[in-house]
Each structure stands twice: as structure tokens, then as C-alpha cells.
Amino acid sequence: SEMYIRDRGTMGFGFPAAIGAKIANPKKPVVCITGDGGFQMNIQEMATAVTQGTGITICLLNNNYLGMVRQMQELFYGKRYSATCLRRRPSCPGGCKGPNDQCPEYVPDFVKLAESYGAYGIRVEKEEDIDAAFAEAKKHTDAPTIIEFMIATDELVLPMVKSGNPMSEMILK
């Protein structure tokens, strides 16, 4: 079975749903695809995932933003960005256009975070490392594996549907 909720569900729902799916179907592979912001909505559930021995794979798309919110602000609100940059600090300049080399380091380090829970963490920064990351994650059936994909800050997640619109008005490009 496949279940896709992208932009049709509550932010942060994917990870706890994946835990439930794995507990209900322990012999089936379960993959959760989530963003860095959404994952942090229920990050404490990593303790449940570890103590229950779920070998789920979490594909965490890290763009240093609340990406879906930023994407809606870009596409539907004239690029008027508000409260979406996860590297923003009070010391950032007022006209900052988002993460750059002057920004503080992004926290948390998801690989270290996974390891601190007793789970596994892998960071992917180059496309050619994807297959090896999934091969490694498949080996871990005793605890979750976070595969953190470092992606461009302005990468759009498509297809998507504007809030309140029907699926027939899906944006494809």
C-alpha cells in the first residue's frame, strides 16, 4: 500500500503516521518523506520509534526553511516571506533574503540527533550518494534511519495544490 499526503495534511503528521504504519505492518518497509520543519513538529516521537524497534526510513528534506509555507508565500503571496527561515536569528539583517554564508549554523544536526536517540543518521549532499544511503538504511531493521537530504533553499515541492482548491487545480510546474 502507498499513502501520500503531501500538502493535504497537518504539518508534522507524516512521522507519527509512519510509526503507526510500521507497528501495524512490521514486515513491510515504511518510508516517511518529510521536511526539516515538519519533522521537528513531532521529533519527540523518535523515542517511540526507537523503543518500538521500528526500522522505518525517514527521508528528511533539509532546505533550512519551513519549505511548504515558504513555497506558498512565493507562489501565492508575492514572495512576501514571513517566519519561514529556520536559520533566522534576532541578529539577522532586516532585508535578509534567506540562508547565506553569513547565517548561523542550522540546528539541529539531524544525523547527531538520530544517533542521540539510538537511531541511525546519514547525510546526503550529492546525488551520487543516494543509492548508498538507501542501501545502508535497509540494513537497519532495529531502529529508524534518518537520511537527511541537503537540498537547495529555493527548491519547490511539486505537484502541489493551493489551500482550499480542488485536486483538479494541482500545480505541476
Identify the meaning behind each predicted range.
Residues 1-5:
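Short, small-residue-biased leader/transition segments that mark boundaries at the very start
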